[in-house]
Amino acid sequence: MLEPLTIGLPARRIIGLIGHNGSGKSTLIKLLARQNPLSAGKISFDGKDLHEWGSRPFARKVAYLPQQAPDTAGMLVSELVALGRYPWHGALGRFGPEDKTRVEEAMRLTDVERYRARFIDTLSGGERQRVWLAMLVAQNPDCLLLDEPTSALDIAHQIDILTLIRRLVDERGLGAIVVLHDVNMAARFCDEILALHCGKLIARGGPEDIVAPDQLQAIYETRMGVMRHPDSGLPLAYPRS
């Protein structure tokens, strides 16, 4: 169960959702993406209740990537990216010049052009995430909702994917809400961090506000220390014995 909260999503900003397992992060983002029905209360987007949006008009505004991506066996990279245009022409609509332009631009922006003729299941985890992000970009939304996009990746690929998200947000003027487990990654890449605990928003602010010992203990229920990164000066959290 989630308690009421308000999230503004300005352009060119990334909001990170953090908290322990079961805190409500994925529940919240699924509600925002209309993947789960509301049991009470309401959610508004762009001045309208979510239930008032048609599926395709909503998908033209908001692109969602679940934690467990759908099966893509036997699908080429170019085919998956092209699916991002579905909200604009539907199942029976003609795939026109603008659709082709958007797909090519999306593959270029996410640097997956070289994989266009590859089967998705032959790619590494990081490469697959880039392709999924390319599909979202081809959708041409205003907002991205990303549920743990780095959870199955090693550190190098986590940084690679979050750097790409940061660049897409900055260059295309998108807003993004990203569920993350690593508070240090959130501090490095997010403009604002929302911390959930047992379905309740318990902290909200920039990295300096959230990555503080008392806040971290309240969020994760364990003692945490904080130091400064020697290069960036950003706060870094670490567990204390």
Please place each PLM-identified region on the residue numbering.
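Helix-to-loop junction immediately C-terminal to a conserved catalytic motif
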Residues: 33
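Catalytic Walker B motif of ABC-type/P-loop ATPase nucleotide-binding domains
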Residues: 144-148
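Conserved ABC ATPase "signature" region
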Residues: 82, 97-115, 140
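Conserved ABC transporter NBD signature motif
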Residues: 41-49, 58
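The feature captures the beta-strand-to-loop junction immediately N-terminal to the Walker
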Residues: 18-20
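Conserved ABC ATPase signature
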Residues: 94, 119-123, 127
